[in-house]
Structure formats: structure tokens, C-alpha cells
A protein has these predicted regions:
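Active-site mouth loops of central-metabolism enzymes
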Residues: 16-28, 103-119, 150-154
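N-terminal binding-site loop/beta-alpha segment at the start of enzyme catalytic domains
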Residues: 1-92
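Short, acidic/polar
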Residues: 24-37, 114-128, 184-192
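Beta/alpha (TIM)-barrel catalytic core signal, keyed to glycine-rich beta->alpha loops juxtaposed to Asp/Glu
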Residues: 29, 142-337
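Short amphipathic alpha-helices and their capping/turn segments at secondary-structure boundaries
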Residues: 1-5, 57-73, 118-133, 217-230
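Short, well-ordered coil/turn segments that N-cap beta-strands
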Residues: 7-11, 41-43, 68-72, 131-135, ...
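Active-site gating/metal-coordination segments in enzymes
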Residues: 87-135
Length: 337
């Protein structure tokens, strides 16, 4: 089923911060953040076992437990199984993400993309989320940022296991859609080229943003649109770099990135618009994009995101960005006049 037929709106909720991403978030604050999203009208919630070793799913399950299940959509991910066994969180190999979830639960996280592990992962997620079904399952992180030069072997394991299992679950009506949830474009290119596998869309984090969109624009968006699929854009603020944060790609931003942010912000300031509005509205301007899911760890962030989505951005801003070479000339822009 096409993602745009499943997703209830352009703005969703990315739950990674609820897994104590970068900081130890008090339980009450985490639950209040989900409640703020619900009160704002957000009805699409994305999660993953990997986020805090199940913590984000547990918190979301608690926060949504009293909400009518037919009124919202959940996506979660497969590829990691969370065990009862406790491990040293500091010793986890998280690839480029380093110690992103060092404040999460200490349960052992096992990377496993087999068919059996996929089914177990979904079953475990349902328990943590306190629900009897999910709408969308993403195969998580089969890419270079986690597996380096071994990523193609991991992808092959997922092809034989997770892809097969999710194809069957969708055909049986257990889930409505599946695809990849990744931070790199290449795995999506590879899956689109495979015979016999029919993903419904993709969650692409950090690769269709104002700061980084060239490869996705050229290699993924046209194929996705042509096939009637859809993209959910995660990380629209590029790990916070676009809105003044110190990080890009989960690491300190390089001078080149900081310079690009400063140049975009100078233009935004001249036009009196927020960087959040620029980021969200750029991502959504591409017709292949079904939704954006900025993460939030504080209730106030929800209202900021909604305001950014509704903010009027003058066409002159987008034209100036293009003239300055700060966006790809082929990128669709929300120019109204």
C-alpha cells in the first residue's frame, strides 16, 4: 500500500530521543512530549527497538495506551533484537553513531536480520508498544554507517531473511507496508534494483535535507515517485546542525557544514523566517516525500515544528538559496508565486 494512503498527515513524530538519545530524559518529560504531539494532532509515530534498547518503544506504548488505536499509525523497525541479558553499554559497537544511546537501557542488543529474528522483533515490539499491530515495518540500518565495508553482506542477509518475512506479513495483512529505514541512499538504490521484492517506501534520515540532498534527489526520488512509493524524511534538521546545533551526522559539524548553515541562516534572517521552517518545507516540497518526522525530547518542540510547517516562507527566500548555489538546481522548491 502506498505510504501516502497510510500516513495521516505530513508531520509525524520521530521517537529516537525518547530512547535517551544523548541525554537522560526524565520519564515524565518523555511522556509529556508524546502527549504534546497527540494534542497537536500528530497521528504518525515512528520508533525502533534500537532506540535506547527498547526504551523509546516502552515509553511510547505507555503514552499512547489510552488513545484509540484506530486513530494513529505506528512504524517500527527490525534488524535488532533486544535481549533480557544485560551488557556494558559503553562497549556497544554502534558504528558512526558512537555513544548516541549510552543513557538507554542496558539490555543486550543483537543485530539479526534473519526471518526468525524479524518475526521475533515485531512480536517483542508489539509488547513494548502495548498494541496488537503495527502499520509499517522498516528494516533498520543495513548501511555503511553501521556496518562499514561489511554492509553489503548484511544487506544480503536481510534480503534472504527480513525482506522475505515482511513481504509475507504484508501479503497476509499483518502489516500494511514495509521498506528500509536507513541513513544512507545506497541501500535504497540497491533494493529498488532487486527483482522480486516490493517495498512500499523508505524512511531516509538525514539525506533529503537542506544540507544534504544531492544523491537522494538524483538517485532515489525519481524512482520512488515513478513507482508510486513514498519517502518518510527523518532527521530533517541534520542532527540539529541546521537549527544551530553543534552536531552533523552524530558528530561535531565540520567547518564546511557550519559555513553552509551560516550562509543559509543569513538568507533566512533577511527574509524573516526560521531555519526550522526552511528545513521542513524544503523536504516536503519533493512530491516523493510522504511525511517528515523530526525528533522531539521536550514538549515545546512539538509546537515549534507545527509552527515551522505553517510558517509562510516567501518565494524570494528559495530563489536566493538557488542563486547562491545552496540547493541543487533540480530540487523542487515550494515557490508559490
Amino acid at each position: 500500500m502506498a505510504l501516502k494512503e497510510i500516513l495521516p498527515g505530513k508531520l509525524g513524530f520521530g521517537a529516537a530521543p525518547l530512547g535517551n538519545m544523548f541525554r537522560d530524559i526524565p520519564e515524565a518529560e518523555a511522556l509529556a512530549t508524546v502527549e504534546a504531539a497527540w494534542n497537536d494532532g500528530i497521528r504518525y509515530y515512528d520508533n525502533a527497538p534500537f532506540y535506547g534498547a527498547g526504551l523509546a518503544e516502552i515509553r511510547m506504548g505507555e503514552a499512547l495506551a489510552d488513545k484509540p488505536r484506530g486513530e494513529y499509525v505506528i512504524s517500527t523497525k527490525v534488524g535488532r533484537v533486544i535481549l533480557d541479558e544485560i551488557e556494558d553499554v559503553s562497549a556497544r559497537d554502534l558504528g558512526e553513531k558512537g555513544d548516541v544511546f549510552k543513557y538507554g537501557r542496558p539490555n543486550r542488543v543483537v543485530n539479526d536480520y534473519s526471518e526468525d529474528a524479524t518475526l521475533r522483533s515485531i512480536e517483542d515490539s508489539l509488547k513494548r508498544l502495548k498494541t496488537d499491530h503495527i502499520e509499517i515495518a522498516w528494516v533498520h540500518d543495513v548501511a555503511q554507517d553501521f556496518y562499514g565495508d561489511e554492509w553489503l553482506g548484511v544487506f544480503e542477509s536481510a534480503r534472504k531473511g527480513a525482506f522475505k518475512a515482511l513481504d509475507r506479513l504484508r501479503d497476509e495483512g499483518v502489516i500494511k507496508a514495509w521498506g528500509l529505514g536507513v541513513n544512507r541512499v545506497e541501500p535504497i538504490e540497491l533494493l529498488l534494483a532487486l527483482e522480486g521484492r516490493r517495498p512500499d517506501g523508505f524512511l531516509l534520515a538525514g539525506r533529503y535535507t537542506l544540507l544534504d540532498h544531492d544523491r537522494a534527489l538524483q538517485r532515489v526520488m525519481p524512482a520512488v515517485a515513478e513507482r508510486g512509493l513514498g519517502i518518510v524524511v527523518g532527521g530533517p534538521y541534520s542532527s540539529g546542525a541546521l537549527v544551530g546545533g553543534p552536531n552533523f551526522e552524530y558528530a561535531p559539524a565540520t567547518p564546511a557544514i557550519l559555513d553552509k548553515v551560516a550562509r543559509i541562516k543569513a538568507i533566512a534572517d533577511r527574509h524573516g523566517i526560521s531555519m526550522k521552517a526552511a528545513g521542513l518545507q524544503f523536504s516536503l516540497a519533493n512530491p516523493a516525500v510522504a511525511a517528515v518526522i523530526p525528533g522531539a525530547s521536550r514538549p515545546g518542540r512539538i509546537a515549534e515544528d507545527r509552527a515551522a510547517l505553517q510558517e509562510r516562507v516567501p518565494s524570494g527566500f528559495w530563489r536566493e538559496l538557488r542563486e547562491a548555489g545552496l540547493v541543487n538546481p533540480a530540487a523542487p522548491l515550494p515557490i508559490a508565486d
